[in-house]
Amino acid sequence: MEGNPGKRIDFVDLTKGVCIILVVMAHIGGAFDKLDKDSMLSCFRMPLYFFISGVFFKSYEGLLGFIVRKINKLIIPFLFFYLSAFLLKYIIWKIAPGVFQLPVSWKELLVVFHGHDLIKFNPPIWFLLTLFNCNILFYLIHFLREKHLPLMFALTLLIGCTGFYLGKLQIELPLYIDISMTALPFYVAGFWIRRYNFFLFPSHRFDKLIPVFVLLALVVMYFTATTLGMRTNNYSGNIFQVYVAAFAGIFMIMLLCKKVKRLKVISYLGRYSIITLSIHGPILHFLGPLVARYIHNDWAQAIALLLITLSICILLTPVFLKVIPQMVAQKDLLKVKQNHTNNPSYEDKQ
C-alpha cells in the first residue's frame, strides 16, 4: 500500500522536534543523563533522526542531480556551520586567550578527516556528513525496489551489518562512512514506511491501539536497550539488541507524536531542525560555563540550559531563514535542473 509522498504530515515535524530536543538534552548531559535509565533514550535517539530523514527521500532526476541536491541540503550547511563555529572559537581565543584551556590551532579544521574524533568546536555537526553518505548509499540501491525488492532489503541488511561489525572491530572508515552503513536500515525503514504503509496516514482504525503499541515498545526496549555511540560507531550490545531496541523506540515516539499531531513550538523546531542541530553545540560551549557560574543545582542548571538554548535557536531560526536560507537547506545554492514530474511539496529539508 503506497501513501501519497506529496502531502505534508504534521506529526513528522513534531517527531523531528522531539528528536532534536532529545539531542540537545544529551549534549547538555548532567541531570538529563539520569533520565536515560538503562539507555532507554540513547538506544533510539540518533536512529530516530536517520529514520525520519528516510521519510523524506526522493530520487529526483538522476544521480548527479540527486548529489547536487544533497550537497545543497547537507554539505553546504555542514561546511558553513563547521567553518563558522571554528572561526568563532578562533576569534574569541585571539581576543581573550584565557577562555580556552588550550590554544586554538588551524589544524583543528582537519579533525573531520581524523577518524571519528570529536569536533570540539561544533560536536553535533558530524550528523550532516553522515546523513549525506546515507542518502548516497540508499540512492545506489533503491532502484532495486521495482523488480528486485528482496535484493534491496538484503543489501540494506548486509550494509547495516557490515557497518555494525566494523564498529565492533574498531575499524573506522573516513568521513563517517561506516556509521552511515550502520544507520542505513533505519533510513530505509523511514523510506518504506512513508511509501508503502498506512502507518503515516492521518487516521486509521489501528490508531486506537496506539497506547498498547507504545506499551509493547517500552517492554521491548526494557529488555533490549543498550548504549549507542553512533558518532564513534561504538555499541555495547549485540546487533539484535541495537536494532530491535532502536526500532522499538522509533515507533514508540512516532506513535505518540501521531496521537498528539502538533505542538506549535516543538513542531517549529522540528521543521527547521537543521538549524538547531547546527548551532546548539557552539551555544552550549559558551553558555554552559556561564549558567554553571550562577546556578548550582544540577536539575535547575540542566533545565535552564535547555530552555535558554532552545529559545536562542528559535529566535535565530527566522534570521537564518531570511538572511542566509541557502546555508540552512531552505534554498539551493547550487542550481539543478527541475524535474516537473516530481512533486516538490514535501521536499527533504532535513
Annotate each language-model stretch with its function:
Residues 1-350:
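Alpha-helical transmembrane segments and their immediate juxtamembrane cytosolic regions
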